[in-house]
């Protein structure tokens, strides 16, 4: 663990250049845009930015394992700050990421060489949206498939509940 958020975010900012070609001075710019897009409910723009982010990862930095892609997702989502929780435990499983904004709650599930449909099915079967049903915000589930071959997002599906 980290003694405080400042140390945690500093460490994660330090890691970004090792996993991507984003420089230290660009990190805040990217993260702010990610948050703005989700705050306005623009999942398509968010996912396109995520694709660009992944496309910038040099081939030699990508070892093609699911753990590598999870690490990059974790870094991006964690740098988004207090709006994001990763590996969110519920009664029947663990959602990969939950993003909360003023008007929206997004539950993300990621698959590597699976399908976006499988990811959505897991959200439904494990009841990942149930804990947020009474919060009064729009609930969106986002199933994302990541292609090991393409080393990027292959397909995503967004469904509003």
Model feature map: region roles:
Residues 74-78, 122-142:
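Metal-dependent nuclease catalytic cores in nucleic-acid-processing enzymes
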